[in-house]
Amino acid sequence: MEAHQFIKAHGITTAIEQAALAAANSALANAVVVRPFLSHQQIEILINLMQPRQLVFRPEVFWNHPIQRVIHNELELYCRARSGRCLEIGAHPRSINDNPNVVHRCFLLPVGRDVQRWYTAPTRGPAANCRRSALRGLPAVDRTYCLDGFSGCNFPAETGIALYSLHDMSPSDVAEAMFRHGMTRLYAALHLPPEVLLPPGTYRTASYLLIHDGRRVVVTYEGDTSAGYNHDVSNLRSWIRTTKVTGDHPLVIERVRAIGCHFVLLLTAAPEPSPMPYVPYPRSTEVYVRSIFGPGGTPSLFPTSCSTKSTFHAVPAHIWDRLMLFGATLDDQAFCCSRLMTYLRGISYKVTVGTLVANEGWNASEDALTAVITAAYLTICHQRYLRTQAISKGMRRLEREHAQKFITPLYSWLFEKSGRDYIPGRQLEFYAQCRRWLSAGFHLDPRVLVFDESAPCRCRTAIRKALSKFCCFMKWLGQECTCFLQPAEGVVGDQGHDNEAYEGSDVDPAESAISDISGSYVVPGTALQPLYQALDLPAEIVARAGRLTATVKVSQVDGRIDCETLLGNKTFRTSFVDGAVLEANGPERYNLSFDASQSTMAAGPFSLTYAASAAGLEVRYVAAGLDHRAVFAPGVSPRSAPGEVTAFCSALYRFNREAQRHSLTGNLWFHPEGLIGLFAPFSPGHVWESANPFCGESTLYTRTWSEVDAVSSPARPDLGLMSEPSIPSRAATPTLAVLLPPPAPDPPPPPSAPALDEPASGATAGAPAITHQTARHRRLLFTYPDGSKVFAGSLFESTCTWLVNASNVDHRPGGGLCHAFYQRYPASFDAASFVMRDGAAAYTLTPRPIIHAVAPDYRLEHNPKRLEAAYRETCSRLGTAAYSLLGTGIYQVPIGPSFDAWERNHRPGDELYLPELAARWFEANRPTRPTLTITEDVARTANLAIELDSATDVGRACAGCRVTPGVVQYQFTAGVPGSGKSRSITQADVDVVVVPTRELRNAWRRRGFAAFNPHTAARVTQGRRVVIDEAPSLPPHLLLLHMQRAATVHLLGDPNQIPAIDFEHAGLVPAIRPDLGPTSWWHVTHRCPADVCELIRGAYPMIQTTSRVLRSLFWGEPAVGQKLVFTQAAKAANPGSVTVHEAQGATYTETTIIATADARGLIQSSRAHAIVALTRHTEKFVIIDAPGLLREVGISDAIVNNFFLAGGEIGHQRPSVIPRGNPDANVDTLAAFPPSCQISAFHQLAEELGHRPVPVAAVLPPCPELEQGLLYLPQGLTACDSVVTFELTDIVHCRMAAPNQRKAVLSTLVGRYGRRTKLYNASHSDVRDSLARFIPAIGPVQVTTCELYELVEAMVEKGQDGSAVLELDLCNRDVSRITFFQKDCNKFTTGETIAHGKVGQGISAWSKTFCALFGPWFRAIEKAILALLPQGVFYGDAFDDTVFSAAVAAAKASMVFENDFSEFDSTQNNFSLGLECAIMEECGMPQWLIRLYHLIRSAWILQAPKESLRGFWKKHSGEPGTLLWNTVWNMAVITHCYDFRDFQVAAFKGDDSIVLCSEYRQSPGAAVLIAGCGLKLKVDFRPIGLYAGVVVAPGLGALPDVVRFAGRLTEKNWGPGPERAEQLRLAVSDFLRKLTNVAQMCVDVVSRVYGVSPGLVHNLIGMLQAVADGKAHFTESVKPVLDLTNSILCRVE
């Protein structure tokens, strides 16, 4: 029971109160402790589910499934307490070490999510052996566990427990397994939601969302952050309905504990099970209302006309009960559907009166409302009809009874009443109720369900056969079958063949035999030394290969050679088939040409022939002029040393990667078995089979994994007679990172092929019994730029690596395309052979690479996101894949959405096969390339430009050429500089290349292309395939001419670089410049170094680089390499240089840019020139910028130099941005607050706070005495003595000051920073040890370019550039200047606002040089601190407000400890500075940088506009790291000075801090620190506190501070322009957005913390609503400033 209200009752005067207190104490003593953080909704759900148990909430952990896990833990305690020493089924890996009473545990080999659970299992104790066996597939090392599952184990045990591990077993299967174990009792915890009894659909209850698709059910509870339960529907129905098992293994099933729909079942072996009826859901809060219409509006209640099942909707029971009561009691004249709908609308709104919920409400969908109205109206009509009939027939019956004589009543009284069947008030059945009759009702009430069914044991085959036949007979009649004997393979038949991709299965003809070279051969590396030298391999690899010897096992079947290479402790597999793709380390592609009849192989410049001889296998290698023969003897070689093998693999990998980075064309990627193998250097279909099942290809070249001497290679399936090549049965890595060869194409069948009555020798059951061979009839419809193709035809004609099956969610044989796959590849549906799962998709390599993809069933629900995911989940592979349109068959997904999803989620080279219907749709909606429309005006202008060009010597080739109006299709490949756009073009793809410059033309011609400049190309582009390089920089009239004349045109270029320049200044170029949209963007550059990428990231946000050069920009060094200039005049003055425009598209190793003063206008007007200049080099770029032109566009050397000087590195770290979102209007209590009067709200605020209008704007208090330092005064102290403001009200609620007054600035300088500092010389170790409670030891911190980028980004957002950052020269005053300003933002107060007598507040600003020097370090340290913060500790603003509010709401029983520092900055001294430096040293900051920081902080000069102060120590609020070090010092003081009991939450931001705890006390060492540093602490301890603009209310959350926000608006100047008024409106709108769901709660809480009336807060919210609506009223006021300062005394020191 909920008894909090009785715990604090004062005085017990009655027996009722005594009983209540005893009940409360007993409930709390036996309460369930809830440890996870929960939302309000989750707390309400748990309280309702766990009744009558008392709950105690002590949040300290975050769980993915908090509700289920709390219930699970409670039921687990119950089961373990009653089972004693027992056998456990499917134990969670984390629970193994905690339960020593378990004598044996039954597991299954982990798949899917179970693998993750085993990875997080303990690595010590009993769990270690279980973990090792499960992850490595090893047998059990002792009898305490097994991996055979409950059904496959026979360990004897009398008692067992199963915690949520029997959902995939039926009661009959469990009965047999218990008999096998000799088990008499089994405690089983199961999740049995009642919705599984309903037809497929989506059901949302107050606790969870259930998705039921007919076979599987997925349950996700409120607030879950990952996937929920996923169970088989038939098994869940069996567990709900069954109370006993009969047969040879009888059982009694009793429900001994229930929490919601979570049950503990006690299964007891009993010889004669007796009836045990039970009501499973007596406390169900939902009623399921049946819709008369099914999906899509089809009638669903009449099976003779439609087989669609009914649709049900979950409706709150109170809604249905009230609706029935209202409708059944209405007067006949008043009853109508309209009144019923009005009443339903009324009770669906939630109504709260104070804390009393008057109406719970219901948030329903349109479909649910329609179904409820229909069902309620018809049900009430039926009841009214029954009532009318009952009264009518009853009256007639009464008339007949009273008309009887005396004898008849006496006979009835004597004989009928004495019968045992007599029940007073029993009604006659007027109608026989059938479940599909409308009169049977429309709703299912789980509260009245009663079950008592028996399940026969599986061993009773006679009963099974009889039930199966009866089931089939009922299906033949067209009735629904609820039999649990559904076939495992699903429904197959003619009704499933609605996909045109389905084809028949024919028998392949026998193929001619090929000479066999199968056997085992010894391959020494010394025999291949000449070949290695011809391959130009490094001497290190040649030497290491010479010391190794491999054993190669060859298997040749059907013109295919499979090799298994044993090299030391590693095993490699390769498959040689004709057309196999060979992996390359460059852009060139290599395909293997293999002729088994001629015994030859060739690819690129390499070829070989082989033949069997008496001495073994003789191979002849031909490569790079080499003709070498080698003979390999049969046998098995001794195993090479594992260390030598690993060293060879590592060296070979480094060589491949080096060639991949630096080679322009590339070569073969050499694998170990490709060099030390029979058919070197080929290794198609390379697969490494590791001894460790979780050791992938990425670890082949490292020593990360322990090297095992004995390697057991997995069994290879025998090769049957099938058309696709066989693939090894196990994947190389868990992620399928293997390059599989494409299947060999099917040869056309001979005219008369004899049928095969049995498979060839060697075929096993694992191979398909029926194979096929079909001629190709596919038709190419479209080709995409990435090489993907769309065909009309059959999927099985594809030669892609993978075939994608349109599977169901269970991956069982079905209809349509799935049935066609089952006929061809039945072994591919074996779940045990699935090598990987990605979402719902399953990958298998048996008998060939196949992906079973799962599309959504659009008959149930349209789910575009699931459709996108179905295609996306098939892309976790290497190689190409062949698709059909997923879901367009049985699942009725429209063709258009499925095709669009494939377009967005496929990989280059994939193929899509369409049936005829989809092909006709595709041809009608064929995707087209981008088009450029040439209008008559553009054509006329272009022809004018061509005429002007043809009159020059350069343009004579264009004479007579014309551009005509029309439409031009084009392909435009855009990319970042150096992305390889030009290198992607091959000679076979193009006839003519058009380039803008001579340098580019020569470069293309050196590669063998026919390249021309834009003018001369006019003679050769007609009807040719044309590629235009650097297209944006071509003169637009020539670009249009070549695009229109070419047969096909492919544009290359970068839209961000230099466009075409109008050299003639005739205005024709900008008039006709075409707007070209790129068809593809390339973001990876192979040219630009890392620092250049960071500089140009603003123009290319997604740029990445493969360059290993980190820094390439240098200033002030001598010129190197190619010189670049901006103007022709500079080119003439620097011989050998080229302009940036001429260098566009070129690549140089080293370049030098010379910026001259005459290029200022060019650079400022065209940033593209700077981008082109920066992106021409690969190694080094020297900048000679005497005029400082590049600094003006943001290219500064000081920022980069200072960053590397401070120890920065190139790299990436976690960004500092915290993602935040706007709260959804789920409660929207703010809508209940109408706009109110601004004047009345502010007057009420003044009345409640006691503030009154004053005739002055501010008071200048007397200036304090200067206690330390030296003050420099201005000559004159005259200033304005009045203030003009546009204000919301004339009463302010802030501590007002005069920031524009010179005397006010002097008072602040002296009063804040001229006070004497109290020094404290002590060790920092004690305070650092105390601080470790919140900030543990940090360790070395890495400062990367990520922090530098964030710093520059912050500068740019403030409108700053790098010009203010100077070289680090401490002799330069501009480097170390600290500027001082007076704050114009005053502090909200409930006290005195004018005559407060306090000096103002100041803010300082360090130089941009120091900010850029220390800023990246402080950002990196802050990130490290955030990563180490304990749970429940919040720092600054680095968290989402909802997370902080949830943590506060979870700390229900806490008080709020608040501390307010007075003069926080002024009291910081040498001790606080020393603590900062100690933490910097702990983080690895360079010593010189720490000493520099200490020097700047210990002695400084604050430079005000007309004053300055030389002082010592203190803290300046505007220096870099202000928030960081203020917060750290705040944490250190609080944790060192105070001890907290029942600590829950702590938050620190600058000098503001709160701690949520039950009580606190001052620690023993606090007085020393407080007195030594002169700290001024003001501590408050109360139920509700204030922190950083929010009200902290434990148990409720962090609420916006309405009073403070409204009060701070009163001191602002909101004029004179309309911009300030708009800023006010936006600020108020943002604040109101935070009040969306908590407005009413804020009224109660904020009024309590400030001691004001709730009506004031209500009125203030209404006032803010009016301001947000743009209805703010401003008043202009002129108020004087009262000067109370005396003459300032000058003291000479």
From Swiss-Prot:
Record region (Zinc-binding): 510-691
(+)RNA virus helicase ATP-binding domain boundaries: 934-1082
Origin superkingdom: Viruses
Listed Pfam families: DUF3729, Macro, Peptidase_C41, RdRP_2, Viral_helicase1, Vmethyltransf
UniProt-recorded name of the protein: Non-structural polyprotein pORF1
Keywords for this protein: ATP-binding, Disulfide bond, Helicase, Host cytoplasm, Hydrolase, Magnesium, Metal-binding, Methyltransferase, Nucleotide-binding, Nucleotidyltransferase, Protease, RNA-binding, RNA-directed RNA polymerase, Thiol protease, Transferase, Viral RNA replication, Zinc
CDD domains with a match to the protein in the record: Hepeviridae_RdRp (cd23259), Macro_X_Nsp3-like (cd21557)
Domain Alphavirus-like MT, chain residue ranges per copy: 56-240
Region feature Methyltransferase, mapped onto this chain: 60-240
Listed SMART domains: A1pp (SM00506)
Location of the region described as NTPase/helicase in the Swiss-Prot/TrEMBL record: 960-1204
Domain (+)RNA virus helicase C-terminal: 1083-1216
Region (Hinge): 712-778
Modification after translation, per record: ORF1 polyprotein does not seem to be processed into distinct enzymatic domains by a viral protease belonging to ORF1, but could be processed by a host serine protease like thrombin.
Protein location: Host cytoplasm; Host cytoplasm, Host perinuclear region
Domains: entry comment: Contains a methyltransferase domain, a Y-domain, a putative protease region, a zinc-binding region with similarity to calycins, a proline-rich disordered hypervariable region (HVR), a macro domain (also called X-domain), a helicase domain and an RNA-dependent RNA polymerase domain. Since the boundaries and the activity of the putative protease are not clearly defined, the zinc-binding region might be part of the putative protease.
Chief location of this protein within or outside the cell: host cell
Macro domain mapped to chain residues: 775-921
EC number: 2.1.1.-, 2.7.7.-, 3.4.-.-, 3.6.4.-
Region (Putative protease): 442-509
Cofactors that this protein relies on: Mg(2+)
Catalysed reaction, written as an equation: RNA(n) + a ribonucleoside 5'-triphosphate = RNA(n+1) + diphosphate; GTP + S-adenosyl-L-methionine = N(7)-methyl-GTP + S-adenosyl-L-homocysteine
Originating species: Hepatitis E virus genotype 1 (isolate Human/Myanmar/HEVNE8L)
Lineage start: Viruses, Riboviria, Orthornavirae, Kitrinoviricota, Alsuviricetes
Domain (RdRp catalytic) ranges: 1454-1565
InterPro entries from the UniProt entry: (+)RNA_virus_helicase_core_dom, Alphavirus-like_MT_dom, DNA/RNA_pol_sf, Hepatitis-E_Cys-pept, Hepatitis-E_hinge, Hepeviridae_RdRp, Macro_dom, Macro_dom-like
Disulfide bond sites: 434-481
Sequence segments annotated as region (Y-domain): 241-439
